[in-house]
């Protein structure tokens, strides 16, 4: 992979997501079929208002969404995919291993392992301080 520093402004050029649903802050490594990105988790996240006010924990499904968005940055940054959308088509073998709380920095790693036409399969994992927080296999459909 190639070490890069893609900031949120550049991420927003690839992804259609916006606040409060943009869950990727920076890309730090990228290759043809692999990406590593960062999500800085703060108490200001809207989901913490209800999940849970006395014990804020990032919902696991949003960790998977952050991983999906990281993979989306990679796919939508390719010139042939400019202006297209990536749709979440499924999750398999998802495991949540560590609670993610305000102040954590999620390191998001996604690797495309299979493609067939507009469908792609990605192995993804999120870590905090080098410890696995979540992992799973994500399926995407590229469309307009």
UniProtKB/Swiss-Prot annotation:
One of its GO terms (cellular component) is cytoplasm. It catalyses: a (3R)-hydroxyacyl-[ACP] = a (2E)-enoyl-[ACP] + H2O. It is an enzyme of class 4 (lyase). GO terms for biological process: fatty acid biosynthetic process; lipid A biosynthetic process. CDD domains: FabZ. Disulfide bonds: none annotated. InterPro entries: FabA_FabZ, FabZ, HotDog_dom_sf. It is found in: Cytoplasm. It comes from the Bacteria. Keywords: Cytoplasm, Lipid A biosynthesis, Lipid biosynthesis, Lipid metabolism, Lyase. The active site is at residue 51. The keyword Lipid biosynthesis applies. Its EC number is 4.2.1.59. NCBIfam families: fabZ, PRK00006.1. Belongs to the thioester dehydratase family. FabZ subfamily. This is 3-hydroxyacyl-[acyl-carrier-protein] dehydratase FabZ. The lineage of its organism: Bacteria, Bacillati, Bacillota, Bacilli, Lactobacillales.
């Amino acid at each position: 992979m190639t070490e890069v520093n893609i900031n949120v402004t550049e991420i927003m050029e690839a992804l259609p997501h916006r606040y409060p649903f943009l869950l990727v802050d920076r890309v730090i490594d990228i290759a043809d079929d692999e990406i590593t990105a960062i999500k800085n988790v703060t108490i200001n996240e809207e989901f913490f208002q209800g999940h849970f006010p006395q014990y804020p924990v990032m919902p696991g499904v949003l960790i998977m969404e952050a991983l999906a968005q990281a993979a989306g940055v990679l796919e939508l940054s390719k010139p042939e995919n400019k202006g297209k959308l990536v749709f979440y088509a499924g999750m398999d073998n998802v495991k949540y291993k560590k609670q993610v709380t305000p102040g954590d920095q999620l390191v998001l790693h996604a690797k495309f392992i299979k493609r067939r036409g507009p469908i792609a399969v990605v192995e993804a994992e999120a870590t905090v301080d080098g410890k696995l927080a979540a992992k799973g296999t994500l399926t995407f459909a590229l469309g307009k």
